[in-house]
A protein has these predicted regions:
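Boundary/entry segment of secreted carbohydrate-active catalytic domains
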Residues: 247-303, 308
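CBM-like carbohydrate-recognition segments
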Residues: 1, 7, 11, 15-18, ...
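Active-site lining segments of carbohydrate-active enzymes
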Residues: 27, 41-53, 61, 65-69, ...
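Long, well-ordered core segments of solenoidal/helical folds
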Residues: 2-18, 53-79, 126-144, 188-205, ...
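Well-ordered alpha-helical segments within folded domains of soluble proteins
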Residues: 1, 31-48, 97-113, 160-176, ...
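Structural helix-adjacent loops and short alpha-helical linkers that scaffold large soluble proteins
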Residues: 1-6, 46-60, 112-131, 137, ...
Length: 339
């Protein structure tokens, strides 16, 4: 694999970007947007591992060339390939495939995780990532999903979970990495994650995954594919990272920070995976713990969850749904934990 990569880097193609099925010469460049997930992270990782700029330079040259060819600067979305230039959906909008753009955005998240902060080339990918995330967030449907066609969901009303999974993954990564504003993007992430968990049936199968293709198509509840599951797991990893402090065995979830600024006692919720002592709570100076605070079990999820609360009474038998004193916080908890 490395030998082949070396050959590609040392013999860059000057071929066309016009993908033609059956003509392997047109696969020498990144001529379809899916390739922006497949190839760039490999070269970014090789650069990181070897510190050899030739991998970075090759990736950067090819990525920018693909961007100039496939990116629509009016819609801030990527065409799947040149065959869709000029095509329209039933509503007259341009054809932008949900999973195609999800491949691109997830690929950008992968690239950014390999490029060191302060690297001159990184700024280009950060700017594109933020630009695309902002556009994608605005295209989420009320049900929390993105659909097969980004600009004509009415023609493809079924959920589509492979695109939704990769979008949630990228958006959650962006918040975790400090690239995206938490207040703006957390509602989108929570809604998307809740939608994904709703798409898992009683047997554990993820449904609503569009089969292998190149453009928007109809999707049914029974359709599944390994890349859809991969997108779901990638999203779950970032959601977990968002919730878990790796230096302590507890989960932090907090509501809108503007609310916290007005009343710091209304904001912090801490879950522990066991019925811990007061010393556990007191060692975190950002959590106010009154002497008469209570610790109550609120869930029988995989991790045994407890909450330390001092601003309300809480009936543990009612679970999260019985907590009526902070509606916004309840929604945040539900979005993070519900299946």
């Amino acid at each position: 694999t490395l030998a082949r990569t070396e050959w590609i880097v040392n013999h860059p193609s000057n071929g066309t970007f016009k993908l033609e099925y059956g003509d392997n010469k047109t696969l020498e460049r990144w001529t379809w947007c899916d390739a922006l997930f497949m190839a760039p992270p490999v070269y970014a990782k090789l650069y990181r591992e070897t510190n050899n700029r030739k991998y970075l330079q090759f990736m950067d040259n090819e990525y920018r060339a693909t961007y100039e060819y496939l990116f629509d600067k009016e819609e801030n979305l990527f065409y799947r390939d040149w065959h869709y230039f000029g095509k329209k959906e039933a509503n007259g909008k341009k054809v932008f495939w949900g999973r195609g753009n999800a491949w691109v955005l997830a690929g950008l998240a992968e690239v950014l995780q390999e490029l060191p902060k302060g690297l001159m080339e990184r700024a280009y990918y950060e700017e594109l990532f933020i630009r695309l995330c902002t556009r994608i967030a605005g295209l989420q449907n009320e049900d929390g999903y993105w659909h097969a066609s980004l600009l004509d969901p009415a023609s493809y009303p079924s959920p589509e979970t492979s695109s939704t999974g990769f979008f949630v993954y990228a958006l959650a990564y962006g918040v975790n990495a400090g690239l995206l504003n938490e207040d703006d993007f957390m509602p989108v992430i929570i809604k998307g994650w809740k939608a994904l968990t709703d798409a898992v049936d009683a047997s554990g199968k993820l449904g609503w995954v569009q089969p292998i293709g190149a453009d928007p198509r109809k999707v049914t509840r029974d359709m599944t594919e390994v890349y859809g599951v991969g997108a779901f797991l990638a999203a779950g990893c970032q959601i977990y990272k968002m919730a878990v402090d790796t230096e302590a065995d507890y989960i932090k979830i907090w509501p809108d920070r503007k609310t916290m600024q007005g009343n710091p006692l209304s904001g912090w919720v801490v879950y522990a995976n066991e019925n811990v002592s007061d010393d556990f709570w007191k060692k975190y100076d950002h959590i106010y713990v009154p002497e008469k605070g209570t610790t109550v079990k609120i869930s029988d999820y995989a991790r045994t969850l407890y909450i330390r609360t001092h601003w309300s009474t809480f009936n543990p038998a009612e679970g999260v749904y019985g907590w009526d004193t902070n509606e916004k916080l309840k929604k945040v908890i539900q979005g993070a934990l519900d299946r």
